[in-house]
């Protein structure tokens, strides 16, 4: 039976996600940015929280873990590295591990760069990937703890997923990401179409997430750092993908 995925806002621009297994009643929250919105979504749906799947240790992703665990007695799953900074961890996971949420299966991808401990959760049967702050719609996360080559390698892992997978990321940054992408890749017709769609969605106060990975592969310039055409646009003909990615990330940092 397919997962029921709910998308909502936490804090100022974080996404909250609930993944519900109708067969067993199990429900997971991907990260725990803020308790109030998560609890309200659970109560509105008549669900009980059984699991929290943590992607990385930043406070805006784990700030509500202790409160939710106290209220629901849920299992807390977190990446191996730096989990001492996360309260009440029950299960620590790494690359290739598979977690069960009821009868739903989530595969762990290690996707470091934004932080060293960052992981993404892939629900293959539901064609969904929760990439938090590694891959955004039309963008990617800042590289705080890792290196640019490390982050590029993480993006390649996500890019390798099928085109019909849906991307669920950590923040509503799509409008800003589109604005930057157009400065580099302004003649990309798919990107221009996505920009128009994002403008319409945000004007209606609607979410831009999920997006399809196939669309990201066409419109997200960070996923195309190994495309010679992108290097040429940056006046970096002959540069490595890692060098091109680093230049893109530096430019976005300053935008």
Swiss-Prot record:
Query: Top-level EC class, please?
Result: hydrolase
The pathway where this protein functions is: Secondary metabolite metabolism; methylglyoxal degradation; (R)-lactate from methylglyoxal: step 2/2
Q: Which InterPro entries does the entry link to?
A: Clx_II_MBL (IPR035680), Glyoxalase_II_hydrolase (IPR050110), HAGH_C (IPR032282), Hydroxyacylglutathione_Hdrlase (IPR017782), Metallo-B-lactamas (IPR001279), RibonucZ/Hydroxyglut_hydro (IPR036866)
Q: Which GO terms describe its molecular function?
A: hydroxyacylglutathione hydrolase activity; metal ion binding
Repressor recorded as keyword: no
Alphabetized CDD domains for the sequence:
hydroxyacylglutathione_hydrolase_MBL-fold
Keywords, comma-separated and alphabetical: Hydrolase, Metal-binding, Zinc
Q: Which Pfam families match?
A: HAGH_C, Lactamase_B
Instruction: Tell me the GO BP annotations in alphabetical order.
Output: methylglyoxal catabolic process to D-lactate via S-lactoyl-glutathione
Bound how, and how many: what does the cofactor note say?
A: Binds 2 Zn(2+) ions per subunit.
Give the catalytic activity. an S-(2-hydroxyacyl)glutathione + H2O = a 2-hydroxy carboxylate + glutathione + H(+)
Q: Give residues annotated as binding Zn(2+) 2.
A: 60-61, 133, 171
The record's listing under SMART domains reads: Lactamase_B
Enzyme Commission no: 3.1.2.6
State the SUPFAM superfamilies in the record: Metallo-hydrolase/oxidoreductase (SSF56281)
Does this UniProt record's set of keywords contain Methyltransferase? Answer: no
Where does the chain bind Zn(2+) 1?
A: 56, 58, 114, 133
Per its UniProt record, the required cofactor names are: Zn(2+)
Q: What does this protein do?
A: Thiolesterase that catalyzes the hydrolysis of S-D-lactoyl-glutathione to form glutathione and D-lactic acid.
The record's subunit annotation is:
Monomer.
The similarity annotation says: Belongs to the metallo-beta-lactamase superfamily. Glyoxalase II family.
Name this polypeptide is given:
Hydroxyacylglutathione hydrolase
């Amino acid at each position: 039976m397919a997962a029921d995925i709910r998308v909502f806002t936490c804090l100022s621009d974080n996404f909250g996600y609930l993944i519900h297994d109708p067969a067993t009643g199990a429900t997971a929250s991907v990260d725990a940015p803020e308790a109030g919105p998560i609890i309200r979504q659970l109560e509105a749906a008549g669900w009980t929280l059984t699991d929290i799947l943590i992607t990385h240790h930043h406070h805006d992703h784990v700030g509500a873990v202790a409160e939710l665990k106290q209220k629901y007695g849920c299992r807390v799953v977190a990446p191996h590295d730096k989990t001492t900074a996360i309260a009440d961890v029950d299960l620590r996971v790494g690359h290739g591990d598979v977690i069960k949420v009821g009868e739903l299966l989530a595969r762990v991808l290690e996707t470091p760069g934004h932080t060293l401990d960052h992981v993404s959760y892939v629900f293959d049967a539901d064609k969904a990937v929760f990439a938090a702050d590694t891959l955004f719609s039309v963008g990617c996360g800042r590289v705080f703890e890792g290196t640019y080559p490390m982050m590029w390698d993480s993006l390649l892992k996500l890019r390798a997923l099928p085109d019909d997978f849906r991307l669920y990321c950590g923040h509503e940054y799509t409008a800003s990401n589109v604005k930057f992408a157009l400065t580099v890749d302004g003649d990309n017709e798919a990107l221009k179409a996505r920009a128009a769609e994002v403008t319409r969605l945000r004007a209606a106060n609607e979410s831009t997430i999920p997006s399809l990975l196939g669309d990201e592969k066409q419109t997200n310039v960070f996923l195309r750092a190994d495309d010679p055409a992108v290097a040429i646009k940056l006046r970096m003909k002959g540069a490595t993908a890692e060098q091109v990615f680093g230049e893109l990330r530096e430019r976005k940092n300053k935008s």
